[in-house]
Amino acid sequence: MSTLIPEFTLPKDFCADAREAYTIPARFYTHQAAFEHEKEQVFATSWICVAHRSELAQPNDYITREIIGENILVVRGRDNVLRAFYNVCPHRGHQLLAGDGRAKNVITCPYHAWAFKLDGELAHARNCENVQNFDKENSHLVPVRVEEYAGFIYVNLDSQAGTVEDQLPGLGAKVREACPQVDDLKLAARFVTRTPANWKNIVDNYLECYHCGPAHPGFADSVQVDRYWHTLHGNWTLQFGYARPSEQSFKFEEGKESSFHGIWLWPCTMFNMPPLEGMMTVIYEFPVDAETTLQHYDIYFTNTDLSDEQLKLIDWYRDVFRPEDLRLVESVQKGLKSRGYRGQGRIMADG
């Protein structure tokens, strides 16, 4: 049980009035003690979005993800059931699989060759028949909660947690409304960065489009930041803006009404539905420590044979749009520790 020291607590009415709101104090973004508390109270108890369903579409498909220092294995069994486990052999603790891919019909530990079925059951342990009182029944992989929800895969380290819908009520319906083809998306590109910034710093940047005009000129040339709304829905939020065709970013038929949807979901995943049909981008955050966050920036299309325009758009995300945000959060993370920063900044509410 993590107990937070007084300097890392806030009053219950903190920022109750948005017109008088400030950011949380800088120390919450920089101090390891705050992060250690978040590991146990946030990330060990919350549903974390880890992938799109297309990455685990076929039997034997698997992915691995690092969540608060725990390597998690998600695999689709030969019976087509999705399961998740701690990616660690119960014998001596060696990691079983790395990266993403297709598993064999048994997962074999590279250390002592213990073999496990895809449902986590121990299939074979060399010499176990000669080991007195060897408990094969209690030598299975340790399971982790996993759910598929509105086209995406979520895991939860808390075996007693409710469902994804319990944590994010109404999110699934909104995702399907904003991107009706969500189930048919396929991964087209992934940009992985080990970002020197606190996970909340990155979330803050996403939640405030106050920076979109000056910091994202290509995005703002399409998505109209003066026709842009942000609504709160408990543990998720929705940003919505009307869009027009742009040669700098999103190209689509002139005269066609289109829009951008941006959804943040607790604690640290961001869904984006650009003003183009059959496309999404997702920012997956995997916090490493108080000032480091591993990020996957994934781009999805419904088609796999990408057009020249889609390839150019991927290049724009990789070379222009994504670096714009990375520079911002990295600079802020440094500035939060400066003697010249007064410890908190104002929230610039619209009114």
Where are these regions (language model features)?
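Rieske [2Fe-2S] iron-sulfur-binding domain
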Residues: 55-159, 163-173
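Non-catalytic accessory segments flanking enzyme active sites
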Residues: 24-67
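C-terminal catalytic domain of Rieske-type non-heme iron oxygenases
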Residues: 3, 75-76, 81, 87, ...
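Terminal targeting/low-complexity segments that flank the catalytic cores of oxidoreductases
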Residues: 1, 26-29, 303
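Generic structural signal for secondary-structure transition and capping sites
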Residues: 43-47, 94, 211
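Short, contiguous pre-domain boundary segments
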Residues: 6-26
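Short Pro/Gly-enriched beta-strand edge/turn motifs at strand-loop
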Residues: 45-56, 125-129, 264-268
